[in-house]
């Protein structure tokens, strides 16, 4: 396999927890939002990052673009560590790295017309003449299933599905290599979700795009992804090619996550979650899942399992699984 387009190595991000008097005193603890996450994304590949809300998947995605500054770890894009770059050094790479947000409408200037919103990234990157930029905007509108008449409209005049198409168009207008899709279809109904996913797949194949697709929806992630990473409490607990993960699910949390989806054709291995979701702070010990895992042992409560490869491309962090 070719060299990865993107490599994340041992990414860490914590947020301070302050006492009753707030920031007058040092933090009393730290919440681990992302804990030692490592993954790779190849050219033309879709990597699905799935997990419950608050598991750190969005923080991981935003760290790639510098929207969140990690505490430690490496984010290598074409071998260059993005965490070590200044704003001036990062700026030329922004054309390669784009994002589609869950709430696209709130990320757009409501006073700008759609044509202006799509031209703006090209102006910032000094791409083309005014006429060339206008033509490219019209082309991208057609490509994402909007019409030329939308050029003069405002974002609030669009439906939910059209707004997401606009978000994808804005991300693609300067021909990026990697797009981070953060819950891009979660607010849409199922029929519109299908249209957006099919469009993303078509555009990806046509442009050899790499996608980091972040979602809490197992079905959506399975549909669009070549490989999937499962996150729980800031930790990557299992990773495999899509079909391998769904036919050979190993981590108890992944099994429970899959079992929560109705009619999933996996009735033979159902794991129900018990216990409370813990606070993943600096004082937390052991496996992140031990408070809710039906198979937890003393070893699980004392020692965090290392991520190990159980077969080519399939990694899992669980003491029960032999490497």
Predicted regions and their residues:
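Short catalytic/signature loops enriched in Gly
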Residues: 4, 17-25, 30, 241-323
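Helix-to-loop junction immediately C-terminal to a conserved catalytic motif
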Residues: 65
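Conserved ABC transporter NBD signature motif
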Residues: 73-81
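Conserved ABC ATPase "signature" region
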Residues: 81, 131-149, 258
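Conserved ABC ATPase signature
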Residues: 154-158, 162
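A short, proline-enriched helix->beta-strand linker immediately N-terminal to the Walker B motif
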Residues: 173-177
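P-loop NTP-binding/switch modules centered on Walker-like glycine-rich loops
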Residues: 180, 184, 188, 192-268
């Amino acid at each position: 396999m070719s060299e990865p387009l993107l490599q994340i190595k041992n990414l860490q991000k914590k947020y301070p927890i302050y006492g009753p008097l707030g920031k007058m005193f040092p933090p009393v603890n730290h919440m681990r939002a992302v804990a030692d996450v490592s993954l790779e994304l190849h050219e033309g590949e879709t990597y699905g990052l799935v997990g419950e809300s608050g598991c750190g998947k969005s923080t991981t995605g935003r760290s790639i673009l510098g929207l969140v500054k990690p505490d430690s770890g490496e984010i290598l894009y074409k071998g260059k560590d993005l965490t070590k770059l200044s704003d001036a050094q990062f700026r030329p790479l922004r054309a390669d790295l784009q994002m589609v947000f869950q709430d696209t409408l709130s990320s757009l200037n409501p006073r700008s017309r759609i044509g202006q919103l799509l031209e703006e990234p090209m102006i910032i990157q000094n791409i083309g003449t005014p006429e060339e930029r206008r033509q490219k905007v019209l082309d991208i509108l057609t490509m994402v299933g909007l019409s030329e008449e939308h050029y003069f409209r405002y974002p609030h005049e669009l439906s939910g599905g059209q707004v997401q198409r606009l978000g994808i168009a804005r991300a693609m207008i300067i021909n990026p290599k990697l797009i981070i899709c953060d819950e891009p279809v979660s607010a849409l109904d199922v029929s519109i979700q299908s249209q957006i996913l099919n469009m993303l797949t078509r555009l990806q194949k046509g442009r050899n795009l790499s996608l980091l697709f972040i979602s809490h929806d197992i079905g959506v992630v399975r549909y669009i992804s070549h490989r999937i990473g499962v996150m729980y409490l800031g930790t990557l607990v299992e990773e495999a090619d899509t079909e391998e993960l769904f036919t050979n699910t190993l981590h108890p949390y992944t099994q429970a996550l899959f079992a929560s989806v109705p009619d999933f054709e996996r009735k033979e291995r159902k794991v129900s979650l018990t216990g409370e979701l813990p606070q993943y702070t600096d004082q937390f010990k052991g496996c992140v899942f031990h408070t809710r895992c039906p198979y937890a042992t003393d070893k699980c409560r004392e020692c965090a399992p290392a991520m190990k490869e159980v077969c080519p491309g399939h990694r899992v962090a669980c003491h029960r699984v032999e490497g």
